Amino acid sequence: MLSQIRTLITILKHTFTRADTVEYPEQKPYLSPRYRGRIVLTRDPDGEERCVACNLCSVACPVDCISVVKTEKEDGRWEAESFTINFSRCIMCGFCEEACPTHAIQLTPDVEMAEYDRQNLVFEKEHLLISGPGKYHDYNFYKVSGKAINGKGKGEAHNEQSPINVRSLLP
């Protein structure tokens, strides 16, 4: 009898408390500024695509949802001919963003990607590219990478030191 009364008191107490759930379409839940959502491809400050098609993002992806096909431009740089992400498989882990050496891949707090057809969740490079630099405004990979381009040798680019002779470090 005592346990039944205790149960009834607990039920009545929870009946008049405020609900913890949020009615999603009407009230948007708070998402932190660092929330990992949809993936975008950014451009450097000059307006060029940052992706150099190194395939590190597709190797780092635990569910294998990123596919990159690369080509080589006239000046010797690599670029992504096609960059495909299957968001129906993506778990938004952020490993691709961490693996990207050029900061081309960035995760945004956009989470509303619901679709009726699964094929609509396969995004190509044209859908992923944004016009701005994203989080890293002044970063330009080819100004700090050490790759010889357009007649400049290694160590002659902006803010770059000349290469170290590895043989001089040997005992």
Swiss-Prot record:
[4Fe-4S] cluster 2 binds at C61, C90, C93, C96. It is a peripheral membrane protein. Pfam families: Fer4_7. Residues 41-71, 81-110 form the 4Fe-4S ferredoxin-type domain. Signal peptide: none annotated. Keywords: 4Fe-4S, Cell inner membrane, Cell membrane, Iron, Iron-sulfur, Membrane, Metal-binding, NAD, Quinone, Repeat, Translocase, Ubiquinone. It catalyses: a quinone + NADH + 5 H(+)(in) = a quinol + NAD(+) + 4 H(+)(out). The keyword NAD applies. [4Fe-4S] cluster 1 binds at C51, C54, C57, C100. GO terms for biological process: aerobic respiration. It is found in: Cell inner membrane. Binds 2 [4Fe-4S] clusters per subunit. One of its GO terms (molecular function) is quinone binding. HAMAP family: NDH1_NuoI. NDH-1 shuttles electrons from NADH, via FMN and iron-sulfur (Fe-S) centers, to quinones in the respiratory chain. The immediate electron acceptor for the enzyme in this species is believed to be ubiquinone. Couples the redox reaction to proton translocation (for every two electrons transferred, four hydrogen ions are translocated across the cytoplasmic membrane), and thus conserves the redox energy in a proton gradient. NDH-1 is composed of 13 different subunits. Subunits NuoA, H, J, K, L, M, N constitute the membrane sector of the complex. This is NADH-quinone oxidoreductase subunit I. It comes from Shewanella woodyi (strain ATCC 51908 / MS32).
